[in-house]
Amino acid sequence: MTNKSVRDYIRTIVDFPHEGILFRDVTTLFADPRGFRIAIDQLLAPYAGMRFDKVAGLEARGFILGGAVAHQLSTGFVPIRKKGKLPGRTVSVSYQLEYGEAVVKVHDDAIQAGERILLVDDLLATGGTAEAGIRLIEQLGGEVVGCAFVVDLPDLGGRKKLEAMGMEVHALCAFEGL
C-alpha cells in the first residue's frame, strides 16, 4: 500500500462556490478513516509535550477537527460560532469580509483567564475568521498558544496575518492559487 499524504485525501472542486475558484474540499479527508487519523496525528505533532487547557474550533469544519484534537489532548472543546447560533450569554467580534462584515461568537464563560488554547480549523485563507477567533479568546483572557490548520492557501495571506499577531501557525499542506 502506498503512503498517502494528507494532501492526497483532499479533493479539489473547480469553480466552486464561484467561477475561477479552486475549492479545497476536506470532507473527503474526513470520510477516510486512515486519512482522518493521519490528519489528527499531524495536527498534534508540533505540540507534543505542550499543555493546553482547551481547543477552540472555528465553525464549521473546525468543530470536526477541533473535537477530535481535544479528545486526543483530553481537554475541553470551545466552539467559535457564527452569529445567531449560540444560546445564552456570549461575546462577539466582527471582522471584514471581501464584501461586508461577519460576526463570530463564543459563550462568555467558555474560556477562563490564563487558559492556554489551541485554535483549530480546516483551512487558512485570508486569516479573517482565525484572527476574529483569536481576538475572542483573548477578550476572555485566554492565551492562544498555537493555530493549527489542515490547509494553508498562502497566496491569500492568512499565515502572514496571524504571524504578524505573534501566532505560531502550523498547516499540514499548502495549495497555491485561489
Curated annotation (Swiss-Prot):
| Stored SUPFAM superfamilies | PRTase-like (SSF53271)
Catalytic activity entry: AMP + diphosphate = 5-phospho-alpha-D-ribose 1-diphosphate + adenine
| E.C. number | 2.4.2.7
UniProt-listed GO biological process terms? adenine salvage; AMP salvage; purine ribonucleoside salvage
Keywords assigned: Cytoplasm, Glycosyltransferase, Purine salvage, Transferase
For this UniProt entry, which segments traverse the membrane? none
- Compartments, record wording: Cytoplasm
| Pathway connected to this protein | Purine metabolism; AMP biosynthesis via salvage pathway; AMP from adenine: step 1/1
GO MF, one term, reads: AMP binding
UniProt xrefs under Gene3D superfamilies:
3.40.50.2020
Highest rank taxon of the organism: Bacteria
GO-annotated cellular components: cytoplasm
- Mind telling me which HAMAP family this protein's record contains? Aden_phosphoribosyltr
What does the function comment of this entry state? Catalyzes a salvage reaction resulting in the formation of AMP, that is energically less costly than de novo synthesis.
Subunit architecture: Homodimer.
Q: What is this protein called?
A: Adenine phosphoribosyltransferase
Organism of derivation:
Cereibacter sphaeroides (strain ATCC 17025 / ATH 2.4.3)
Gene expressing this chain: apt
